[in-house]
Amino acid sequence: MIGKLSGRVDSSYDDYVIIDVSGVGYRVFASAKTLSKLSEGESYKLFIETHVREDHINLYGFLSLEEKSFFNLLQSVNGIGTRMALSILSALTPTDIQIAINNEDKNIFKAISGVGAKLAERIVRELSDKVAKISSSSAAIKDSLNIKGITPVASSEVIKALINMGFSRFEAQNAVQEIITKNPEISIDELIRTALKNRNSNF
């Protein structure tokens, strides 16, 4: 089995790239997020998940072991295969997925093409216990909310305030994490103002 490929992107297509490794071209399927980071002519290291079937051998590539882990985790849900797993990872990062599952936010998944209400419910239900077992950024999220005086209690209040101002819980948590990571010494008032400013600039 192939576990990793290091080579140059020879050509790219809608859902895969050809990786040239010492003159041999490997077709590697990947999420849209990963494909957007791969430039033709540049060299990369991709972690590979190999799927062997009677009629084909497919390689799936990831820039991080975390994304690869979530690719496999998603396929443990009844009704999700490799294509759907990549579609979900094309729309959401592993951190996004973990936050959505922890918050039982089915709407995040329902917004993805091909994911209906029943499948979204299964994702949240079937992965609620499993998602905590994967080494992801949950610890980083917790730490980022507990540095330089921004305590978990304070960050929770900020998140509640943002929700009252029209944010979804998912948006509020992501906004708080991103801002504190960039500016650990930010005050609570400035944190709220920055979150609102960033949100308005995205519309």
UniProtKB/Swiss-Prot annotation:
Would the keyword DNA-binding turn up in this protein's UniProt record? Answer: yes
Domain of life of the organism in this record?
A: Bacteria
Keyword hit for Translocase: no
Q: Which residue ranges are recorded for the region named Domain III?
A: 150-203
Q: Which InterPro entries match?
A: DNA_helicase_Holl-junc_RuvA_I, Hlx-hairpin-Hlx_DNA-bd_motif, NA-bd_OB-fold, RuvA, RuvA_2-like, RuvA_C, RuvA_C_sf
Region entry Flexible linker, spans: 143-149
The record's subcellular location field reads: Cytoplasm
SUPFAM superfamilies in UniProt: DNA helicase RuvA subunit, C-terminal domain, Nucleic acid-binding proteins, RuvA domain 2-like
Q: Which GO terms describe its molecular function?
A: ATP binding; four-way junction DNA binding; four-way junction helicase activity
- Please provide, in alphabetical order, the Gene Ontology terms of the cellular component aspect for this entry: cytoplasm; Holliday junction helicase complex; Holliday junction resolvase complex
Return the Pfam families for the record.
Answer: HHH_5, RuvA_C, RuvA_N
Q: Which GO terms describe its biological process?
A: DNA recombination; DNA repair
Q: Which UniProt keywords apply?
A: Cytoplasm, DNA damage, DNA recombination, DNA repair, DNA-binding
- What residue spans carry the region label Domain II? 64-142
Q: Where is this region: Domain I?
A: 1-63
Which NCBIfam families did the record assign?
A: ruvA
Subunit composition and interactions:
Homotetramer. Forms an RuvA(8)-RuvB(12)-Holliday junction (HJ) complex. HJ DNA is sandwiched between 2 RuvA tetramers; dsDNA enters through RuvA and exits via RuvB. An RuvB hexamer assembles on each DNA strand where it exits the tetramer. Each RuvB hexamer is contacted by two RuvA subunits (via domain III) on 2 adjacent RuvB subunits; this complex drives branch migration. In the full resolvosome a probable DNA-RuvA(4)-RuvB(12)-RuvC(2) complex forms which resolves the HJ.
* Comment on protein domains: Has three domains with a flexible linker between the domains II and III and assumes an 'L' shape. Domain III is highly mobile and contacts RuvB.
Q: What is the recorded function of this protein according to its Swiss-Prot or TrEMBL entry?
A: The RuvA-RuvB-RuvC complex processes Holliday junction (HJ) DNA during genetic recombination and DNA repair, while the RuvA-RuvB complex plays an important role in the rescue of blocked DNA replication forks via replication fork reversal (RFR). RuvA specifically binds to HJ cruciform DNA, conferring on it an open structure. The RuvB hexamer acts as an ATP-dependent pump, pulling dsDNA into and through the RuvAB complex. HJ branch migration allows RuvC to scan DNA until it finds its consensus sequence, where it cleaves and resolves the cruciform DNA.
Describe the family membership recorded for this protein in Swiss-Prot or TrEMBL.
Belongs to the RuvA family.
**This protein is called what?**
Holliday junction branch migration complex subunit RuvA
| Native species | Rickettsia bellii (strain OSU 85-389)
Which lineage?
A: Bacteria, Pseudomonadati, Pseudomonadota, Alphaproteobacteria, Rickettsiales
